[in-house]
């Protein structure tokens, strides 16, 4: 039996709270749902319903860290370039303008997880002095969650 081939994309999300489209001062909170919806909308706009249907087979946002803004997206090996292009063309999540930067593409979740863990730890060390107790607790929870990431 042949296993299903996936690609895992590690991305960094840059939020721009100063240029909020509605003029409100609060930036959006990054969640798996928000990111997934933005990418699916981009696939629909750029590739149509057929492109969206072919991409949804294994598309999933596996991990999102709302503090460091790192996320892991899974897609099928056949459609990963289409998903990658759609990710590049995402301009906003909700009403907040964003830029998505691809950091790594991997064929297995373990390699992507290790890279994400390394990036998360580096970013956490850089900004740990300016974080509140709640944010530090949330960051530690996110680090534990990524260590358990397998499927």
Swiss-Prot record:
Keywords, comma-separated and alphabetical: Nucleus, tRNA processing
Traits of the deletion mutant: Defective embryo arrested at the globular stage.
InterPro entries membership: Pop5/Rpp14/Rnp2-like, RNase_P/MRP_POP5, Rnp2-like_sf
A single GO BP: tRNA 5'-leader removal
Gene3D superfamilies: Ribonuclease P, Pop5 subunit (3.30.70.3250)
Keyword Nucleus on entry: yes
Compartments it resides in: Nucleus, Nucleolus
Entry's Gene Ontology cellular component terms: nucleolus; plant-type vacuole; ribonuclease P complex
Main location: nucleus
Gene Ontology MF, one: ribonuclease P activity
Superkingdom of origin: Eukaryota
Subunit-level organization: Component of nuclear RNase P and RNase MRP ribonucleoproteins. Interacts with GAF1/RPP30.
Task performed by this protein: Essential protein required during embryogenesis. Component of ribonuclease P, a protein complex that generates mature tRNA molecules by cleaving their 5'-ends. Also a component of RNase MRP.
Family stated for the protein in its record: Belongs to the eukaryotic/archaeal RNase P protein component 2 family.
Protein name: Probable ribonuclease P/MRP protein subunit POP5
Native species: Arabidopsis thaliana (Mouse-ear cress)
